[in-house]
């Protein structure tokens, strides 16, 4: 048999075994990393299609390679669907990731040395919002804003004060670990007052926006970036939305400014995921995502959990994630992550504002509900998993008993039963 037509398990059993093991891990445990989700089978089929073979530098109707008539159709479908989904004037679906979408947007709007404002990384921001070792911190002068120590929410008075003092060229509104909604209208007002562009990074909450369960930043921002996984639940990739006025700058910054050939197989998967995101089923799933996060937050602020030094930042959540404060607990973030992993729940340790511990240890956990909602979890299931987490964070936890409860939930909601 030609190697061209040899199945993976025959051609490369080592890689196949690792893939099989990962499938088993996803099926048998509970995924609660806030940035992770499960892509529909149709999305994975599109991403694994023959479109992976096609080079297509340029844009639909304006390619530098022949034979692009079919990938042109696919890419235009993705563009049209995401524009309609979010009410955008322009969309570029070629960025390979959210980080590359952010980089391209900044390259389109800024010059090296310009000033940008973004949420401090330790207060919930993202690497690409101005971290010193990231391109954004190396190319631009960064002024960081923070959350209020009392409320745990972004301090808009500080944002306005810093903007007036530093006169940034770009203000970034968005986050990677923040449990509340942002006031996009207030951010735009401040941006207009100082002559800045407003860029919103909605990578984490784009699915909630698509479902109408979170304010849409598109009417307020000059540019909006997002990933296509996380709450959107599609393939790993990025998208840039903008005003029509900025379309040419955005497109040029992506290609040829930052990328060469687009990944048309991933763009096909994006197109499928945008169709899914417009469905009633998706909207219902996003509601369960929100409900699950609120159930979790409510369980983790009860007296029995507070008694062991565990608390919830900002007192709750408006989105798909909960940030757990372990500063008064006997556990640090790494230990808490390991303990939940022991019972079959995957989360990530996360720095919190004014964290006294180093970044690889941390004093916090970031726990999300999108993957469980995609798996079919209902309110009663989220109540059960919230109780498992609460019990696991106590000194007297019973690992075997908690793992049995996790296994029961995983068995109740089988994942990808047709995959082997």
Curated annotation (Swiss-Prot):
Q: What class of enzyme is it?
A: transferase
Please provide one cellular component term from the Gene Ontology annotations of this protein: cytosol
UniProt EC number: 2.1.2.1
What PROSITE patterns does its record include?
SHMT
InterPro entries with a match to the protein in the record: PyrdxlP-dep_Trfase, PyrdxlP-dep_Trfase_major, PyrdxlP-dep_Trfase_small, Ser_HO-MeTrfase, Ser_HO-MeTrfase-like, Ser_HO-MeTrfase_PLP_BS, SHMT-like_dom
An MF annotation (GO) of this entry: glycine hydroxymethyltransferase activity
Q: Which cofactor does it need?
A: pyridoxal 5'-phosphate
**Where does the record say this protein resides?**
Cytoplasm
Site annotation (Plays an important role in substrate specificity) points to: 229
Q: How does it assemble?
A: Homodimer.
Q: What is the protein name for this chain?
A: Serine hydroxymethyltransferase
